[in-house]
Structures are given as C-alpha cells and as structure tokens.
Amino acid sequence: MDKSKRLFLKSKRSFRRRLPPIQSGDRIDYRNISLISRFISQQGKILSRRVNRLTLKQQRLITIAIKQARILSLLPFRPKAQRFKKAQRFKRRQSTARTVGLRTRNK
C-alpha cells in the first residue's frame, strides 16, 4: 500500500471482551438463587437477553428457573422495597386538632 492511502487507515482500538455471565460450571436451577438473582431487575422483572448477554437456551432456562423459584416462594414476585412503600402509604396517621388556639364566642 502506498503512503497516500495509509493516512486514511484507522488504527484498531483494543477492547477487553466481557466474561460470560454464566460460566460452564454454573447450574441453572431454581434452587440456585445467587445465580438467578443476577438476572432480575430492581423492580423484580426478568431482564432481557440482550441485557443479560445470554444465549437463547440459557435465557429460556433462566426464565423457567425464575418462574419456578417465584412459585415455590424462594424469590418474591415483587421486591421488598415496593411492598414497604405500599404499606407506608395506607398507614393511619395521628389526628390533629383543627383549631389553632382557644377561641371563645363573643356574646
């Protein structure tokens, strides 16, 4: 390649390939809560395959495992923070006096 064309070539940037989220030794099972909880959002939703960087088969197995764990109440359907906020909303408050000071009637 001559010198005039070399000016337009971009240098390739190096990048570090991310490690796969599931190693070969990990078992995708409803009892493996530490593994399953990595694929659930803070709202308690199952994260998409694109976000998780999983294969189709792995995503299917993770989804089934999460659903089984929820049914067997190993995982909550909703995270605890939301339940706490809801309970706080309906909490009864103390009644306050409507009058500011003592008022007397003028006769």
Swiss-Prot record:
Compositional bias ranges of the Basic residues kind: 85-95
Compartmental location: Plastid, Chloroplast
Keywords on record: Chloroplast, Plastid, Ribonucleoprotein, Ribosomal protein, RNA-binding, rRNA-binding
Keyword Ribonucleoprotein belongs to the record: yes
Pfam families: Ribosomal_S18
Keyword Plastid annotated: yes
Domain of life (superkingdom): Eukaryota
InterPro entries: Ribosomal_bS18, Ribosomal_bS18_sf
GO molecular function: small ribosomal subunit rRNA binding; structural constituent of ribosome
Gene Ontology biological-process annotations: translation
Cellular component GO terms held in the UniProt record: chloroplast; mitochondrial small ribosomal subunit
Principal location: plastid
Region (Disordered): 85-107
NCBIfam families associated with the record: S18
Assembly mode: Part of the 30S ribosomal subunit.
PANTHER family according to UniProt: 30S RIBOSOMAL PROTEIN S18 (PTHR13479), SMALL RIBOSOMAL SUBUNIT PROTEIN BS18M (PTHR13479:SF40)
Family in the record: Belongs to the bacterial ribosomal protein bS18 family.
Official protein name in the record: Small ribosomal subunit protein bS18c
Gene source species: Oenothera argillicola
Lineage of the species this protein comes from: Eukaryota, Viridiplantae, Streptophyta, Embryophyta, Tracheophyta
